[in-house]
């Protein structure tokens, strides 16, 4: 009798994706982040669902409903902080996952890569709207500043912003619709993640050496299931350390002040995972230019496959490209730091230089260095 997992229509899909899937024998821990992102997404949906049971999306009661969750709901505090810090873990895994893709040339699977970029935008949109929901000072002013950026769009800008707001300022209508979108988007993200996997399994996984691994495959289970479980345990350990020891480490204290349209906080800044993009936005004096740079800072990933000039897929055997890659990482850390600083000298100049360097590395230096490396191979 044939095994039911290989014949049953539903079990067959799971079997071909997670059990009998032929995987390269040499993929490293950098390939763990896909499964970790899946775990993060499930965790966020579950904690979010329980938070939504107690949250009210009304300007008069939103802040106090979050307080009520933390004070009065059984284990409400841990659910709330797991959700808030779970978002941070989600983005850490996302950045490492994208970084892995850049380093090892995983962008050479264009469908998987492009769905990944759409996923990144969707998760960023979800996180932004989630940050508005507690209706603290940073929630309100963050929503005001970021939605206001759309007014830079010529001709339709102002009408578009008022349409998104549902009025002439960020108010009750804005909060209600943001809650609705924040609730539905993670399910759209789940569907996109399934498509992401579908395209990945069409080609099979990349591996650190960057050469085809068809001649040397091993079954996903038990080898990579156990490896993923180890990664998951480490993820949960770090998350729970954050939640139980310093839950507000990555948050902004201003968000414990209820939203007040009449009082602007001294420094309006988004959550840490948006700071690099925020720094790029601020480093351009022109409003429309800043918005375009902000969008392009993520969208630039879409043209990376077109700029691949190297004869090798990954950077494993390309020391010059490796140096450039780690310079890019340092540059992104610099941008993240600048995004959290006030707009004054010397931070403005550092931000502008870091922004120029970011685009220069991705668009000019990487392809150029790859050509130089190709020529070095001939020596």
From Swiss-Prot:
GO biological process: mitochondrial electron transport, ubiquinol to cytochrome c
Ligase is among the record's keywords: no
Positions bound to a ubiquinone: 201
Keyword presence, DNA repair: no
Compartments it resides in: Mitochondrion inner membrane
Disulfide bonds: none
Membrane disposition: Multi-pass membrane protein
PANTHER family the record matches: CYTOCHROME B
Protein name: Cytochrome b
Organism of derivation: Martes melampus
Annotated gene: MT-CYB
